[in-house]
Swiss-Prot record:
Motif (Involved in the stabilization of the negatively charged intermediate by the formation of the oxyanion hole): 91-93
GO molecular function, one term: carboxylic ester hydrolase activity
Subcellular location: Cytoplasm
InterPro entries in the record: AB_hydrolase_3 (IPR013094), AB_hydrolase_fold (IPR029058), Acetyl_esterase (IPR023508), GDXG_lipolytic_enzyme (IPR050300), Lipase_GDXG_HIS_AS (IPR002168), Lipase_GDXG_put_SER_AS (IPR033140)
Protein name: Acetyl esterase
Subunit organization: Homodimer. Interacts with MalT and MelA.
Top enzyme category: hydrolase
Any matching Pfam family: Abhydrolase_3
Family: Belongs to the 'GDXG' lipolytic enzyme family.
Gene behind this protein: aes
Length: 319
């Protein structure tokens, strides 16, 4: 669809979302639109520093975890000594951007609101790593902490996965991977999914929404996919197109959050409708007036803070 045929999104978003969009960081260089992925990663990390400030303090530990691909960094956020469960967080960034620093505030708030240990996994980015390496690294980290739970003083009897955007896909894909391959890493009590993509190739919201303001034009989405997948056949893998997986049985309880003006919104709606149709435990909540990636902006947006609280509350209700 031609850009002029799309909705005038920036006129329709909420007042608090407009404030975020109009927030300038004078010390930031311009976005390197034609730069290398390395330059874009560097910019993204710098840009997120402002939004990560002021997060709650808590005990934090970092560990390198062995996988068949090499060492992967993890970061543990421990709000209390006797955590009722452990929640693994997978950051978004289109599979090509992001790290544990860019999503630090999100993980800290999630730990604070749930009172569970949150473990961020710094999976290898694409295109250096191709599907399914990130999922295999996440699963390896889960297995490692399950085996070493006593040494690390964490509760791995009940676990969960959480993620935003591409991280939401990785969160649900990892939970399904554990189920399908019958890997025991503790009971998966819940999965928290904020504005993820789950396998649609086209949709109404993808046609009407997406632009330079969110980095989710049709061309952007194609670029992320080409960086992440190894070959064309991967598009139909049940761990990339999650709608090709069996969503009729033993899916952990899912909290599915949608942003009103997100081109990926129909992915979330379809996931919810599919799970609900097959009596799989799930909850869907739409956050009005929001753009994709709004979870980052809790410094300025009450809605972002609410979305994190909602996810934390859903998870603790499953314990």
């Amino acid at each position: 669809m031609k850009p002029e045929k799309k909705l005038p999104v920036l006129d329709l978003i909420s007042a608090e979302m407009k404030t975020v969009v109009n927030t300038l960081q004078p010390d930031l260089p311009p976005w390197p639109a034609t730069g290398t992925i390395a330059e874009q990663r560097q910019y993204y990390t710098l840009e997120r520093r402002f939004w990560n400030a002021g997060a709650p303090e808590m005990a934090t530990r970092a560990y390198m975890v062995p996988t068949k691909y090499g060492q992967v960094e993890t970061r543990l956020f421990c709000p209390q000594p006797d955590s009722p469960a452990t929640l693994f967080y997978l950051h978004g960034g289109g599979f090509i951007l992001g790290n544990l620093d860019t999503h630090d505030r999100i993980m800290r708030l999630l730990a604070s609101y749930s009172q569970c240990t949150v473990i961020g996994i710094d999976y290898t980015l694409s295109p250096e790593a191709r599907f399914p390496q990130a999922i295999e690294e996440i699963v390896a980290a889960c297995c490692y902490f399950h085996q070493q739970a006593e040494d690390y003083q964490i509760n791995m009897s009940r676990i969960g996965f959480a993620g935003d955007s591409a991280g939401a896909m990785l969160a649900l894909a990892s939970a399904l991977w554990l189920r399908d391959k019958q890997i025991d890493c503790g009971k998966v009590a819940g999965v928290l999914l904020w504005y993820g993509l789950y396998g649609l190739r086209d949709s109404v919201t993808r046609r009407l929404l997406g632009g330079v303001w969110d980095g989710l034009t049709q061309q952007d989405l194609q670029m992320y996919e080409e960086a992440y997948l190894s070959n064309d056949a991967d598009r139909e893998s049940p761990y990339y197109c999650l709608f090709n997986n069996d969503l009729t049985r033993e899916v952990p309880p899912c909290f599915i959050a949608g942003a009103e003006f997100d081109p990926l919104l129909d992915d979330s709606r379809l996931l919810y409708q599919t799970l609900a149709a097959h009596q799989q435990p799930c909850e869907f909540k739409l956050y009005p007036g929001t753009l994709h990636a709004f979870l980052h902006y809790s410094r300025m947006m009450k809605t972002a803070d609410e979305a994190l609280r909602d996810g934390a509350q859903f998870f603790t209700a499953q314990l």
